[in-house]
Amino acid sequence: METTSFGFAASLLFVGVPTIFLIGLFVSTSDGEKSSFYSDTSKGRLSPEPKK
């Protein structure tokens, strides 16, 4: 019983952690692209010289 529960937890961690990491990475990347795009176009905070 202990071995199977450990194996279940290990497989759950092995599958769940990369999935959550990939989802979080995808969300943060898309959100970062959006925010950087908006801040770059409206305020130009990312670039030292404003492009106009």
From Swiss-Prot:
Name the GO cellular-component terms. photosystem II; plasma membrane-derived thylakoid membrane
Q: Where in the cell is it found?
A: Cellular thylakoid membrane
User: Which residue intervals make up region (Disordered)?
Assistant: 31-52
Please provide the Gene Ontology terms (biological process) for this protein.
photosynthesis, light reaction
Task: Extract the InterPro entries matched here.
Answer: PSII_PsbM, PSII_PsbM_sf
**TM segments?**
6-26
Does the keyword Hydrolase belong to this entry?
no
Q: Which UniProt keywords apply?
A: Membrane, Photosynthesis, Photosystem II, Reaction center, Thylakoid, Transmembrane, Transmembrane helix
Asked if Lyase is a keyword of the record, the answer is no
Bias kind Basic and acidic residues: ranges: 42-52
Where this protein primarily resides, as one coarse class? membrane
Signal peptide location: none
Per UniProt, what is the membrane topology? Single-pass membrane protein
Q: How does it assemble?
A: PSII is composed of 1 copy each of membrane proteins PsbA, PsbB, PsbC, PsbD, PsbE, PsbF, PsbH, PsbI, PsbJ, PsbK, PsbL, PsbM, PsbT, PsbX, PsbY, Psb30/Ycf12, peripheral proteins PsbO, CyanoQ (PsbQ), PsbU, PsbV and a large number of cofactors. It forms dimeric complexes.
Q: What does this protein do?
A: One of the components of the core complex of photosystem II (PSII). PSII is a light-driven water:plastoquinone oxidoreductase that uses light energy to abstract electrons from H(2)O, generating O(2) and a proton gradient subsequently used for ATP formation. It consists of a core antenna complex that captures photons, and an electron transfer chain that converts photonic excitation into a charge separation. This subunit is found at the monomer-monomer interface.
Q: Which HAMAP family match?
A: PSII_PsbM
Q: Which family does it belong to?
A: Belongs to the PsbM family.
State what protein this is by name: Photosystem II reaction center protein M
Lineage runs: Bacteria, Bacillati, Cyanobacteriota, Cyanophyceae, Synechococcales
